[in-house]
From Swiss-Prot:
Top-rank taxon, per record: Bacteria
Naturally occurring in which organism (per UniProt): Protochlamydia amoebophila (strain UWE25)
Role summary: DNA-dependent RNA polymerase catalyzes the transcription of DNA into RNA using the four ribonucleoside triphosphates as substrates.
GO process annotations (BP): DNA-templated transcription
Name the UniProt record assigns to this protein: DNA-directed RNA polymerase subunit beta
GO MF annotations, alphabetized: DNA binding; DNA-directed RNA polymerase activity; ribonucleoside binding
Quaternary structure and partners: The RNAP catalytic core consists of 2 alpha, 1 beta, 1 beta' and 1 omega subunit. When a sigma factor is associated with the core the holoenzyme is formed, which can initiate transcription.
EC number: 2.7.7.6
């Protein structure tokens, strides 16, 4: 029978309303949208790579006679599979070919141009770059759009301001000053130039005062009939200039206050109609600004604007106009993005639809709207509010696709300049211009290479265990280009915000300088099309909680009253009580259930996946839960992993989505199983048998072992989606990072002082915490100036004993035991010949010593290496000239076999395609015309009966050349033809790769490398004193003593305790979850079941005591123990139970280090520091004080001179040791010389003088 995950008993059998989404969807979906590899070129949406090409192209030459247009792009198929790329140390990528159309004086030319390679994401959401798996972490950054802020001025009054942040381009800011005037700033960080808001509005096209007043105020026409009307208008603001049409005399300008005298002059002139700004007065900011404004027309405002942003340059009208166009109205230089436009319109209350979202530049209306809102804020209007920049409505996620898209944009923008230059410099008289001659592939592939290799967001994947891998892909970072700076980020940015609920985990974040800047997505969170994080809620209608799900962003959630998932419901899905706890605008309060609009889908939607794996999380202090979350990622995969007795129910899902386990793709029956592969016959007879290859003893990024073990047997019935093989740190398809061990919380001879852990020898004997490590050693033989390096067994001046494990080629045999200093691969390098002395030449001539012109450059096992050689891989180039006749004959025979296989595969694919197309179309009536794209010839007429001949005519054409209407039959036909072309491409790539390998060997080696050898050494690490262990509740400690099983305390049944923890580690740390887990663990173990205690809905205390009683155990969970040494009973009863403990990747064997001799620092001449540098321990300031306190003068002198940086003294002491003398004559420490040089560098004439001893 297939071993499925065991059923876990739960106290609360509430069904989940909604399944967890795919946990690595954030990576896969984003990259698929960027690449759109599965879509036909003409069906691709204008997003991702397609969008970048359409933005940059068409490119015109400076004289606009030559135009280069982008038509489509095509992606090849990968040369090797991901496993092979890791093995060879190369990048998993595909070729990118782009079809361009060039139009010039000679005509139109179309050509497909090779544009380099582009890395491809694996099924697990990772990239393989130079043989290492990497993850591109999603970035959390400030969303484009508009935000309104307030700050207190030094005088005490509040200053209001707004900021329009584009996706690309100049920032536009507006702020009140202390005189209630609004000034506009452009790129405030770069230059502090301020422009009066009305001047800026005029420069945008609102030329007159009346235009500006019309935008900001309600205006109305007044007829002056009598004295009463006359008196009513005094003190009002004019909305239009009052001009005598005949004489042209101006009686009052727009924005001026009407006085009695002015009105009298107007009436006397016979003018009886004037326009007034209804809601304006002298204190209004706009009226104040118009009074102060030095400009009065569009032209003067433009010039004034230009003088401010480009001081010192001549302010002509055309310059000014093009400057403002470039800054805000040119889509190539200024882009709000769809998200920026969405945020701007929603804040200013404008319409949001697809058409509006396409407007990516700034509008005049946007600036007017922002200024109006700012004035409303100043006036204290309830409709206007300040933005919280830490709210998730104002922060968005840039996922992998968007990050790479931005890099492609940079690469293509560089390429655009090169293309223009080439168009200009091309000599049309001597040659014909084609796209291939002006398009260079370097721009794009160079930028991508740089991004994957150097960017802060492209990270070497944490592959310690499946949970570490999964968490790394779901990580959100506020750091990186365009993000925050670790040193300048304040407390507010790092803090937990109410809008994080259900979106970002409040617990999982690193300790240290990155706290709060790096976080993790919550378990149910998704990212929407604008990059905002959404979380699901159940909709509540008239008090009834429906199963309808609505995903909401932090902004949308602000308008809703949301009940908790734990609120009790009756059988009709109505709230059981009239009052419940709910959230509104981030605040928790009790409310009437009638007001509730939504309800949480699950209590665990608050936390991330790894935090959701901690049982009884609700009983742990947040600081310890944080440590528990982080330490689960450091758990080492064990030799015999066991799933926890007390889980949370997320174990199986986490294992599945991490990619550690092997999953069946379709229903079927197991035909064959062994340690290397599983063969399944599908239930659908049309499909071939599917072979699943298992990963065997592969080295992970962290040096741990990746090994898959089959869970099924021959004859088992398999359903699609079943787990058919376990991976590292999984047990029957569930995550299993550690082991269940019998624990006692008690002190034991002081060995568990300060969180130390005592373990029984039984854990070592039964390999509870034994793990497998794999180290990789690499050696390359190159072609040097002096000759070729050679990998060989024939090494000068090396004993046969040293070479005993090397084969004839000089490479260590598989299975050999390795110790530090052993030769793994023998290599000799030519060394430069020096002129020999005559007598030396004579000796050489007599004895024929040829070995002296090469030196030994073998690969030696470094200190600390112990284990067994488990694999050796050799890669080499093949030179046709160096092959023997036999090798050439063998090669010819193999080439024939490869060609035969290639032709057979091609024929099989053609037959398969023919059968599928025949089954779909033969003797059917054509549902529409099928037309050839280039020749416009009709291949199939609508209404025709489709015959075998028509099918053969269709099959001859490429799917890209066929134009057919949208309907079910033709969509299926396109898919069949597309699948065939991809399969054919894959077969061709494999064929070419095999041919290349036969003729030239491994061509992927770096230039100059002839041969490369990789040796893999596996070592078994048992638990030892000094290793770090931890539970899931942040209860960490170091193994202090391994006690013989006979000496461990034991129960009355004779069962010995396996691990002893300090009871003082619980109360002050407030992680009571470990006690609940211990009690429930022993109850479940004695009942023979496994249990799940999901976060925030776990087993209550009463239920645990009930289970203890049922299992016949003491109700308080305390047992009397007996001393293993004396056999006497301890006085007090002790908490005993089963706890899940992990061994962490901080192993003492990797940390312990000693130095006898080794390298010294160049400047100070002191030994280097750290294990990697073979460094020493510093005898520091405090240690010197301690020695001084004892008056140990001779010891101190030795420590600070000859044992450290006294160069001459070091040599002398060495000589005296060799001669057997006991002399110490110390000189000057080098660090003293450094100090003198530094003082001399400051201009102080400091020097040492020799003093006469007498």
């Amino acid at each position: 029978m297939l071993q499925r995950p065991p059923h876990r008993e739960s106290f609360n059998d509430k069904e989940e309303i909604i399944d967890l989404p795919n946990l690595i969807e954030i990576q896969i979906k984003s990259y698929n949208q960027f690449l759109q590899a599965d879509k036909f070129p003409d069906e691709r949406e204008n997003i991702g790579l397609q969008e970048v090409f359409t933005e940059i192209f068409p490119i015109k030459s400076y004289d606009e006679k030559t135009i280069l247009e982008f038509l489509s792009y095509n992606l090849g198929v990968p040369k090797y599979n991901p496993e092979e790329c890791i093995r060879r140390g190369i990048t998993y990528n595909v070729t990118l070919k782009v079809k361009f159309r060039l139009t010039d004086e000679t005509g139109i030319k179309e050509e497909e141009v090779y544009m380099g390679t582009i890395p491809v994401m694996t099924d697990k959401g990772t990239f393989i770059v130079n043989g290492a798996e990497r993850v591109v972490v999603s970035q959390l950054h400030r969303s484009p759009g508009i935000c309104f802020e307030q700050e207190r001025h030094s005088r005490g009054n509040v200053i209001y301001s707004f900021r329009i942040i584009p996706y690309r381009g100049s920032w536009l800011e507006g702020a009140f000053d202390t005189n209630d005037l609004i000034h506009i700033y452009i790129d405030r960080k770069k230059r502090r130039r301020k422009i009066l808001a009305t001047t800026f509005i005029r420069a945008l096209g609102y030329s007159s005062n009346s235009d500006i007043i019309e935008e900001f105020f309600t205006t109305r026409k007044y007829k002056i009939k009598n004295e009463k009307e006359f008196a009513k208008l005094v003190g009002k603001i004019l909305a239009q200039d009052v001009v005598d049409e005949e004489s042209g005399l101006v009686f009052g300008k727009a924005s001026e206050k009407l006085t009695t005298a002015m009105l009298k002059r107007i009436v006397d002139a016979g003018i009886d109609v004037i326009r007034i700004a209804e809601d304006a007065d002298e204190t209004s900011p706009v009226i104040k600004m118009l009074a102060k404004d030095p400009t009065d027309s569009y032209e003067s405002a433009l010039k004034d604007f230009y003088r401010k942003i480009r001081p010192g340059e001549p302010a002509t009208l055309s310059n000014a106009r093009s400057a403002i166009m470039r800054l805000f109205f040119d889509p190539k230089r200024y882009n709000l993005g769809r998200v920026g436009r969405y945020k701007l319109n929603s804040k200013l209350g404008c319409e949001i639809n697809d058409e509006k979202l396409q407007t990516v530049t700034l509008d005049k209306e946007d600036v007017i709207g922002a200024l109006k809102y700012l004035i409303m804020l100043k006036s204290g209007s309830e409709e206007a509010s300040i933005d919280d920049i830490d709210h998730l409505g104002n922060r968005r996620v840039r996922s992998v696709g968007e990050l790479i898209q931005n890099q492609c944009r940079i690469g293509l923008a560089r390429m655009e300049k090169i293309i223009r230059e080439r168009m200009n410099l091309f000599d049309f008289s001597s040659d014909t211009l084609t796209p291939g001659k002006i398009v260079s592939a370097k721009g794009l592939s160079g930028v991508l290479k740089d991004f994957f290799g150097r960017s802060q967001l492209s990270q070497f994947m944490d592959q310690t265990n499946p949970i570490a891998e999964l968490t790394h892909k779901r990580r959100l970072s506020s750091l990186g280009p365009g993000g925050l700076n670790r040193d300048r980020a304040g407390f507010e940015v790092r803090d937990v915000h109410t809008s994080h609920y259900g979106r970002i985990c409040p617990i999982e974040t690193p300790e240290g300088p990155n706290i709060g800047l790096i976080s993790s997505l919550s378990s149910f969170a998704k990212i929407n099309e604008f990059g905002f994080i959404e979380t699901p809620y159940r909709i509540v209608r008239e008090g009834v909680v429906t199963d309808e799900i609505e995903y909401m962003t932090a902004d949308q959630e602000e308008q809703c009253v949301i009940a908790q998932a734990s609120a009790p419901l009756d059988e009709y899905h109505m709230f059981a009580e009239p009052i419940c706890w709910a959230r509104y605008k981030g605040e928790q309060f009790e409310t009437d259930t009638k007001n509730v609009t939504h309800m949480d889908v699950s209590p665990k939607q608050l936390v991330s996946i790894v935090t959701g794996l901690i049982p009884f999380l609700e009983h742990d202090d947040a600081n310890r839960a944080l440590m528990g979350s982080n330490m689960q990622r450091q758990g080492v995969p064990l030799l015999k992993p066991t799933a926890p007795i007390v889980g949370t129910g997320l174990e199986a899902r986490a294992a599945r989505d991490s990619g550690a386990v092997l999953i069946a793709h379709e229903d079927g029956v197991v035909d064959y199983v062994d340690g290397l592969k599983i063969v399944i016959s599908p239930d659908d007879n049309r499909l071939e048998k599917r072979t699943y290859l298992l990963k065997k003893f592969i080295r992970s990024n962290a040096g741990t072992c990746i090994n898959q073990r089959p869970l099924c047997h021959v004859g088992d019935k398999i359903k699609a989606g079943d787990v058919i093989a376990d991976g590292p740190a999984t047990d029957k398809g569930e995550v299993a990072l550690g082991r269940n061990v019998l624990v006692a919380f008690m002190p034991w001879f002081g060995y568990n002082y300060e969180d130390a852990i005592i373990i029984s020898e039984k854990l070592l004997r039964e390999d509870y915490y034994t793990s497998l490590y794999i180290e990789e050693f690499e050696l390359t033989a190159r072609d040097t100036k002096l000759g070729k390096e050679e990998i060989t067994r024939d090494i000068p001046n090396v004993s046969e004993e040293t070479l005993r494990n090397l084969n004839d080629d000089g490479i260590i045999r598989i299975g050999a035991e390795v110790k530090p200093g052993d030769t793994l691969v023998g290599k000799i390098t030519p060394k430069s010949e020096t002129e020999l002395a005559p007598e030396e030449r004579l000796l050489r001539a007599i004895f024929g010593d040829k070995a002296s012109d090469v030196k030994d450059a073998s690969l030696i096992a470094p200190p600390g290496t112990e284990g067994v050689v488990m694999d050796v891989k050799v890669f080499s180039r093949r030179d046709r000239l160096s092959k023997t006749d036999d090798e050439l004959v063998e090669e010819a025979s193999k080439l024939k076999d490869i060609q035969r296989e290639y032709k057979s595969n091609q024929a099989q694919l053609r037959t398969e395609k023919h059968e599928r197309v025949g089954a779909l179309l033969l003797n059917e009536t054509a549902p529409g015309n099928i037309v050839h794209r280039r020749t416009a010839e009709i291949i199939v007429d609508e209404g025709d009966l489709i015959t075998q001949d028509l099918i053969e005519a269709l099959e001859k054409e490429s799917v890209e050349d066929l134009l057919m209407p949208e309907n079910d039959i033709y969509t299926t036909l396109r898919q069949i033809l597309h699948d065939y072309e991809i399969a054919l491409q894959t077969v061709e790539t494999q064929y070419k790769t095999q041919l290349e390998f036969m003729r030239k060997g491994d061509t992927d080696l770096d230039p100059g490398v002839i041969r490369q050898v990789k040796v893999y050494v596996a070592s078994k690490r048992k638990l030892q004193v000094g290793d770090k262990m931890a539970g899931r509740h942040g209860n960490k400690g170091v193994v202090s003593k391994i006690v013989p099983e006979a000496d461990m305390p034991f129960l009355s049944t004779g069962q010995t305790i396996e691990i002893i923890l300090n009871p003082l580690g619980v109360p002050s740390r407030m992680n009571m979850g470990q006690l609940f887990e211990t009690h429930l663990g022993i109850a479940a173990k004695h009942t023979g079941i496994t249990v799940k205690s999901p976060v925030f809905e776990g087993f209550p205390e009463e239920k645990i005591w009930e289970m203890m009683k049922k299992a016949g155990l003491p109700e308080d969970g305390k047992f009397f123990l007996y001393d293993g040494c004396s056999g006497e009973r301890f006085d007090n009863s002790v908490v005993v139970g089963y706890i899940y403990m992990l061994k962490l990747s901080h192993l003492v064997a990797d940390k312990i280090h000693a130095r006898a001799v080794g390298p010294y620092s160049l400047v100070t001449q002191q030994p280097l520091g750290g294990k990697a540098q073979m460094g020493g321990q510093r005898f520091g300031e405090m240690e010197v004080w301690a020695a001084e306190a004892y008056g140990a003068a001779h010891l101190l002198q030795e420590m600070l001179t000859v044992k450290s940086d006294d160069v001459a003294g070091r040599t002398r002491i060495y000589e005296s040791i060799v001669k057997g003398e006991n002399l110490l004559k110390s000189g000057t420490p080098e660090s003293f010389n450094v100090l003198i040089k530094e003082m001399q560098g400051l201009g102080l004439n400091v020097y040492t003088e020799a003093v006469d001893d007498s």
